[in-house]
Swiss-Prot record:
Gene3D superfamilies, sorted: 2.40.50.100, 2.40.50.150, 3.90.1100.10, DNA-directed RNA polymerase, beta subunit, external 1 domain (2.30.150.10), DNA-directed RNA polymerase, subunit 2, domain 6 (2.40.270.10), RNA polymerase alpha subunit dimerisation domain (3.90.1800.10), RNA polymerase Rpb2, domain 2 (3.90.1110.10)
GO molecular function: DNA binding; DNA-directed RNA polymerase activity; ribonucleoside binding
Ranges where the record places region Disordered: 1372-1392
EC number: 2.7.7.6
Family: Belongs to the RNA polymerase beta chain family.
Keyword Isomerase annotated: no
GO CC terms, sorted: DNA-directed RNA polymerase complex
Superkingdom in the source lineage: Bacteria
Protein name per its UniProtKB record: DNA-directed RNA polymerase subunit beta
Record keyword Protein transport present: no
Disulfide-bonded cysteines: none
Subunit structure: The RNAP catalytic core consists of 2 alpha, 1 beta, 1 beta' and 1 omega subunit. When a sigma factor is associated with the core the holoenzyme is formed, which can initiate transcription.
Length: 1392
């Protein structure tokens, strides 16, 4: 068990010293979990970077090579691709985020233009001229370290797509097409790009072929087009039998397989002996047939009538006269036989079709085919593909050759070829990516075999037949489309200019290629705005696999089978995590250990089992490869030597679960976690939850808002650290070293390992402070290290949002009681204690971004200024002299964030206006106030302001101040880097120089002196370099240090100057924009009724009431509970995991309190302990709590380490209970007992209002609760007046449009039912779309009057207009006022 402790605190890294998670898992993982965002990184890396050392060509280069060389139409010039290179990006990620631009690298492509001279007589070409040139071909977006892209300043993720693998698929219609219910088999050859080829049986059992789903043709037409004759076709698909005439019948060889299971209608006689072998009408069993063969039966005698109805294999022709006796494929009949008798032919070669094992399908198709040779077949194919065009032989040839045999137009891809080879047992190289005749024949042969009942159809939903296209491949395909568009333009340009005088640059217009890339990143369905709510949602988004998108499925068309969980998903795709709703099953998540192989298939790792012993050798297998193995589960019991303990092992084979004998096992799972995705693996006791609730649990963790103070779960699964690290939320040290400086905004590390010449010896980590995420949550990083700490590469040095001590921390551990409380937890409502609000337990910070732009309008430029017409000083209190809000200002709804004025058109002035203008100056009249104001419902603190100016526009004071601050920051970084470099360099210089004899010295020293420390201290640093020493070796080292130092200083200065230059340069703003101001407002959101909360087990609810602490139920020792949940939410939903979590959390807290008590007692007993003394009592308590496996780890710590560890256990002792390998019921009981608590996990509770004890014990414990991103503040909304829709004149809907509440059909019924006529009339008229009426109501209310009249709703007018547009003239007429009994007035003539 020592390994168990080790895996928790391996050689203690910076965060592991502060906390140990007690692990309940027993299964040792044989392989490390791959990096969680490897899928994205690997794929893009393969797209961008070639590796000549291993002969790997990047996807980008492949694409360029597939389009180049481009030749002009006359063949006089050729533009060829040599190589490409990506230069350094102009701006780094942070600059792109701030400026709103794309993070990309300029791409230079070296092209070679070759000009030929064509000799028209001999038709040969000779090279006239070769020109090479680098051409700029736009910017290629780069991926950040975290697997995302910055496009126009927003972070996006390219989701991987799952699609049908190229290759061949065999299927049948499940008897749905034909009324008889017989299966119609079909085969489909799917290329990566090019025409689809479908083969199918129809109801008459004829084999047809369709190209690109066009009209069907007999399959033999396709075979004719491949150059086969009728005879060749028949002889390829059928065996031949030779029949020889005997006196009383025909002799035929005895083939065992043809007779097994058949029932002859005649006596079958042995030709040699004349004995009856098989009697007529009796079924021949396989045993009987085999026995006959064994006894030496080799030739049978069958009656002549038995030959009738068989088919000839060849044409039989009279050589001399040319008369055809019988054609290949014709039926043998009595007349034919007579002719053959007359001709003296006594040997017949017939096709081996016995209608039992082999059916006449191809022969029937051949006979039904109207085409008889290649030319007819080709013209039939041409007519189907190009209806309405008359075929000529050449065009038909060219069309057919281009369909499947031209690499330009048809590409199976390496994957397609591999799949084809595997399915059909071929052995073509995977570089052959077009179809061959033998491929087509093999497909038809397999289809016919299926019809004959041999072989199995394929399962489309098997992961062996679906593959993943990741970023690199998706972009490659898109770029190819762009290049092909470019190719057309280049060809036209080549034919219209004089090629001998141009350079490659003049021919290439890279716009189409650049546009294709931009379109892909900007608007493709798979390029998505990153879900950045918390680190887990980021990781999950990057690991998502979607079946939707271009070339994929659509929601409406996807049936149940595609969405369902398939046995091959095991270890590859998570069966739990998928959205609820219309996308269920179409959007999936990769399992934890899964990875995508070079062909795009998802692989999962297994341990090899050799001779019944499990080895530590790990193999990654795709679904196709796995199908041949029997795989044991990860939890199978093993002996210490790796052999299985039990005789029968629970295993999987070909998608079935079975108990297999141990000798049969060939592989074993690596870990129980490999089944589920990252989000599901974070749910403790997942094995005790119902699948539907686990699904909700894993989806809701992604919506947890990062809280003000993160707190890792006391009951975790051990995956928390992995997610925090791989998501990039927590910062890991790039190289080992010593912490040199730390403050809230940056960490400076002096590197001690991987220090190479030409590489800085200093790592500066800038922490993100109060940055806005895509979902408006707050990204804030905090350092975890102190100056002087030694860190190793990979240690966590700073926490990010939702992480604590390098572990994912999405929520809080809170004390929960399961009991009803006065109906406040009815229907999943949640009752919470006021303490939670007061102590900011679930408070989160949200950052909203507001921006305003000053444009150049027709009437003059807009201006951002403090000088706004008709605005009092009170409204301007937060603005500086440039008219922009201060950082730190508290702002509320309607407050001005940036003052802006827009010129308005001149209108003739009244005398009063002229007078005002003369008195008060210009401004007031010709501009209007268009300032940026805070929208309703938002209030908070301004945390950041950014000002962007167009090139050549003077910067205002605010912009200059911001720029100065930024330059100061850069200068500090450069100074620090220099200082550390100086310290390190001069210290190694001192070690080198002291004790050496000098050969050259600066002024004031004597040559030949021995260098001493005092001498160096007295010298100025710059003079140290003037020293030279006698010893050659030392002198060489001295010069090397000098060169390295100069190089490093140069690099630091260059970096600084480059950054400053970028800052001082103007910004690239959209056309017409002169200036842009962005203001970021941080809003503190406390928990309040209406907010949604959830646990990790799908137990979600809305807060119904916040109760004063004194009214909450309390425990025996007076501790009030934090949350009261409804016990009825558990049984029907079957998510029992939450109860086990409650118990274990309760035990954790109990143990934590024991340790805290021991620590306090020790402190009381040793008030003046300096920190060097070992707190023995505390250490013993820790050993007692953690158990034997952790003793070694605890004893290896010093006194300070023990105290730090103990003081971190206040909240509770952290547990890790991995999914499917976690704490059992007994473990939970043991922990409760160890903590000195009741084993039932229940406690006596007292009512906070009366002090009375509740009748029975209540389950109380600690649960990890999350606050979800569904906050009532974002949803609550009210409208008094606001915008109306143009046509219907009804208020708009929704909070974003400041709309009203819809009063729909059903609500109208409700008012009708109550007879509330006046309310109903108001709702349908003056409160909605009676334009005149609502204006009158407004006027009346303003005057204090409350009588009003309803008019005609606008929607009625719309209806009338619509009817008129149909030619029905509808007019309204009123009853005559004098005589109410009279009918309506007659309509005018037009209506008749």
């Amino acid at each position: 068990m020592a390994t168990k402790a080790k895996s928790v605190g391996q050689a203690l890294e910076a965060t592991a010293t502060k906390r140990i998670r007690k692990l309940f898992g027993n299964i040792h993982e044989a392989v490390e979990m791959p990096n969680l965002i490897e899928v994205q990184r690997e794929s893009y890396e393969q797209f961008l970077r070639s590796d000549p050392s291993i002969g790997y060509v990047s996807g980008l280069e492949k694409t360029l090579r597939s389009v180049f060389p481009i030749r002009d139409f006359a063949g006089t010039a050729e533009l060829d691709f040599v190589h490409y290179e990506l230069e350094a990006p102009k701006y780094d990620v942070e600059e792109c985020r701030q400026r709103g631009i794309t993070y990309a690298a300029p791409m230079k492509v070296t092209l070679r233009l070759i000009v030929f001279e064509v000799d028209s007589e001999t038709d040969t070409r000779s090279v006239l001229d070769i020109k090479e040139q680098d051409v700029y071909m736009g910017d290629m977006p780069l991926m950040t370290e975290n697997g995302t892209f910055f496009v126009n300043g927003t972070e996006r993720v390219i989701v991987s797509q799952m699609h049908r693998s190229p290759g061949v698929l065999f299927d049948h219609d499940r008897g749905k097409t034909h009324s008889s219910g017989k299966f119609l088999f079909a085969a489909r050859v799917i290329p990566y790009r090019g025409s689809w080829l479908d083969f199918e049986f129809d109801a008459k059992d004829i084999v047809n072929v369709r190209i690109d789903r066009k009209r069907k043709l007999p399959v033999t037409s396709l075979l004719y087009a491949l150059g086969m004759t009728g005879e060749e076709i028949l002889n390829h698909f059928y065996d031949r039998l030779v029949f020889e005439r005997a006196e009383n019948g025909w002799k035929v060889p005895f083939m065992v397989e043809n007779w097994r299971g058949s029932k002859p209608a005649f006596d079958v006689v042995d030709a040699k002996t004349g004995e009856v072998v098989f009697a007529a009408g009796h079924k021949i069993s396989p045993r009987l047939a085999n026995k006959a063969a064994k006894d030496g039966l080799d030739t049978l005698l069958i009656p002549t009538e038995e030959i009738f109805g068989r088919y000839s294999a060849y044409d039989l022709i009279n050589e001399s006269t040319g008369e055809i006796y019988i054609e290949a494929g014709d039926e043998v009949s009595a007349e034919n036989l007579e002719k053959l008798d007359a001709a003296g032919i006594d040997k017949l070669v017939l096709l081996d079709i016995d209608h039992n094992n082999t059916g006449p399908w191809i022969r029937n198709t051949l006979k039904a085919d109207k085409a008889e040779d290649r030319d007819q077949a080709l013209s039939d194919i041409y007519r189907v593909m190009r209806p309405g065009e008359p075929p000529t032989r050449e065009t038909a040839e060219a069309l057919f050759a281009g369909l499947f045999f031209d690499p330009e137009r048809y590409d199976l891809s390496a994957v397609g070829r591999v799949k084809l080879n595997m399915r059909l047992g071929l052995d073509a190289e995977d570089t052959v990516t077009t179809l061959r005749s033998e491929d087509i024949l093999a497909v038809v042969k397999e289809l016919v075999n299926l019809k004959d009942g041999k072989g199995e159809i394929d399962d489309i939903d098997n992961l062996g037949n679906r593959r993943v296209r990741s970023v690199g491949e998706l972009l490659e395909n898109q770029y190819r489309v762009g290049l092909l568009r470019m190719e057309r333009a280049v060809k036209e340009r080549m034919s219209s200019v004089d090629v001998s005088t141009v350079m490659p640059n003049d021919l290439i217009n890279a716009k189409p290629a650049v546009a294709a890339v931009r379109e892909f990143f900007g608007s493709s369905q798979l390029s998505q705005f990153m879900d950045q709510t918390n680190p887990l949602s980021e990781v999950t988004h990057k690991r998502r696999v979607s079946a939707l998108g271009p070339g994929g499925l659509t929601r409406e068309r996807a049936g149940f089978e595609v969405r369902d969980v398939h046995p091959t998903h095991y270890g590859r795709i998570c069966p739990i995590e998928t959205p609820e709703g219309p996308n269920i099953g179409l959007i999936n998540s990769l399992a934890t250990f899964a990875r995508v192989n070079k062909y795009g298939f998802i692989e999962t790792p297994y341990r090899r089992v050799v001779d019944g012993k499990v080895t530590n050798e790990v193999v990654y297998l795709s679904a196709m490869e796995e199908s041949k193995h029997t795989v044991a589960q990860a939890n199978a019991d093993l002996n210490p030597d790796g052999s299985f303990i039990d005789e029968l092992i629970s295993a999987r084979e070909a998608g079935e679960f079975l108990m297999a004998p141990r000798e049969q096992i060939t592989l074993m799972d690596v870990s129980p976690k490999q089944l589920v995705s990252v989000a599901a693996s974070l749910i403790p006791f997942l094995e005790n939850d119902d699948a539907n609730r686990a699904l909700m649990g894993s989806n809701m963790q992604r919506q947890a808002v990062p809280l003000l103070r993160a707190e890792a779960p006391v009951v975790g699964t051990g995956m928390e650290e992995t997610v925090a690290r791989d998501s990039g939320a927590a910062i890991a040290a790039r190289r080992g070293g010593v912490i040199d400086q730390v403050d809230a905004t940056r960490i400076v590390i002096r590197a001690t390992d991987m220090v190479e010449p030409g590489k800085s010896g200093v790592d500066i980590y800038r922490l993100q402070k109060f940055q806005r995420s895509n979902q408006n949550t707050c990204i804030n990083q905090r350092p975890l290290v102190k100056v002087g700490d030694v860190v190793r590469a990979g240690d966590i040095i700073a926490d990010g949002p939702s992480t604590e001590l390098g572990e994912l921390a999405l929520g809080k551990n809170v004390l929960v009681a399961f009991m009803p409380w006065n109906g406040y937890n009815y229907e999943d409502s949640i009752l919470i204690s006021e303490r939670i609000v007061k102590d900011d337990v679930f408070t989160s910070i949200h950052i909203e971004e507001f921006e305003v732009t000053a444009r150049d309008t027709r009437l003059g430029p807009e201006d951002i200024t403090r000088d706004i017409p008709n605005v009092g000083e009170e409204a301007l209190r937060n603005l500086d002299e440039a008219g922009i809000v201060y950082i730190g200002a508290e702002v509320g709804p309607g407050d001005i964030l940036a003052g802006k004025i827009t010129p308005k058109g001149e209108s003739p002035m009244t005398p009063e206006e002229k007078l005002l203008r003369a008195i008060f100056g210009e401004k007031a009249s010709d501009v209007r106030d268009t300032s940026l104001r805070l929208p309703p419902g938002v209030s908070g603190t301004v945390v950041e302001v950014r000002v962007f100016n167009r090139h050549g526009i003077d910067k205002d004071e605010r912009a200059i101040a911001i720029e100065r601050e930024e330059i100061e920051r850069l200068k500090q970084d450069a100074d620090d880097e220099r200082a550390i470099l100086n310290r390190a360099t001069f210290s190694s210089l001192k070690d080198l120089l002291v004790g050496q004899a000098t050969s050259a010295v600066p002024k004031g020293l004597k040559k030949g002196d021995i260098v001493t420390e005092e001498m160096l201290v007295g010298l100025d640093r710059a003079d140290w370099w003037k020293l030279a020493v006698v010893d050659d070796k030392a002198q060489t080292a001295l010069e090397a240090i000098k060169a390295q130092y100069d190089d490093a200083i140069k690099r630091i200065n260059a970096k600084y100057e480059d950054r400053v230059e970028k800052l001082q340069r103007g910004d690239e703003l959209a056309p017409g924009v002169l200036k842009m101001v962005k203001v970021f407002v941080a809003v503190k959101r406390k928990l309040q009724p209406g907010d949604k909360m959830a646990g990790r087990h799908g137990n979600k609810g809305v807060i119904s009431r916040i109760l004063p602490v004194e009214d909450m139920p309390f425990l025996e020792d007076g501790t009030p509970v934090d949350i009261v949940l409804n016990p009825l939410g558990v049984p029907s939903r079957m998510n029992v995991g939450q109860i086990l979590e409650t118990h274990l959390g309760w035990a954790s807290r109990g143990l934590g309190q024991q340790v805290t008590r021991a620590l306090e007692e020790w402190r009381d007993a040793n008030p003046d302990a300096t920190g060097g003394e070992m707190p023995e009592a505390v250490r013993e308590k820790l050993e007692h709590v953690y158990g034997a496996e952790y003793v070694e780890d605890i004893r290896s710590r010093d006194a300070e380490g023990i105290i730090e560890l103990a003081s971190n256990l206040k909240v509770g002792v952290p547990f890790a209970t991995p999914v499917f390998d976690g704490a059992k019921e007994a473990d939970v009981s043991n922990m409760l007992t160890l903590a000195g608590l009741d084993e039932s996990g229940q406690s006596d509770l007292y009512d906070g209002r009366t002090g009375d004890k509740f009748d029975r014990k209540v389950t109380v414990g600690y649960i990890y609760m999350l606050k979800l991103h569904h906050l009532v503040d974002d949803k609550i909304h009210a409208r008094s007046i606001g915008p109306y829709s143009l046509v219907t004149q009804q208020p708009l809907g929704g909070k974003a449009q400041f709309g009203g509440q819809r009063f729909g059909e059903m609500e109208v019924w409700a008012l009708q039912a109550y007879g509330a006529a006046y309310t109903l009339q108001e709702m349908l008229t003056v409160k909605s779309d009676d334009v005149i009426g609502r204006t009158k109501v407004y006027e009346a209310i303003v005057k204090g009057d409350d009588t009003f009249e309803a008019g005609i709703p606008e929607s009625f007018n719309v209806l009338v207009k619509e009817m008129r547009s149909l030619g029905l003239n509808v007019e309204l007429s009123s009853y005559a006022e004098e005589d109410p009994d009279e009918g309506p007035e007659a309509l005018p003539e037009a209506a008749e």
